[in-house]
């Protein structure tokens, strides 16, 4: 009971920070971009997503965004302006909410995210979505879930492993990832000097830090570590980290894994105003904007089959 109260206080404070971030990132809806807000993919109050796209009759690749918030907080509205950037560039940008821990434990959120994706794919023709071109993206906890979505789409046995009932399991395949300030290894991350990280993982796993320290079965940690799904089949990826983020080692380790597996990737360190955790999604600041431009060029090459461009930044 005390832990749930603590998480509620933490969530309240996180939501205040999120709203400040939303104000800092605010921009008007771009001309020609249509907003469909609060689309329900389930009966629960959190089971909603938004769709941002240009209603021009052209086929559009799908850009799926999953927000962060330490597994216990956050809201898709904070990331709306980041999604606008992709809608402007011809994507159908989907922005998903999911249920928070500790009420939902891993892999509940994965099941919910795939349920939202299924709901939209059922309507792909209505919005002229090209389901053969899919980008999945997220920041912080959203990058954690995005890695799972991408990895599961390539290693389909994990649908059954995680109990995911997904109508499009045989055909859905992620073309590229955009992973911002993510976390990918449970066992290592528990010891990082990142505020409240042990509480976040307690909420997600149902285990205290002391309990997890006494677990010697690596299969427990594997279940909560999306890096285990990363092999040569993983899609081309953009890895963005903030230079003053105590989690940046996770992005560096992830990039090394992609390099080892010979997966095409772009690794972009964001500095300046964007140098703090999750700040690179603010495209109004210098390195946030430059990171976006580099990301778009990378996606043009691997998703939109554009002319090869220089990946170095």
Predicted regions and their residues:
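Alpha/beta-hydrolase superfamily serine-hydrolase fold, recognizing
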Residues: 1-313
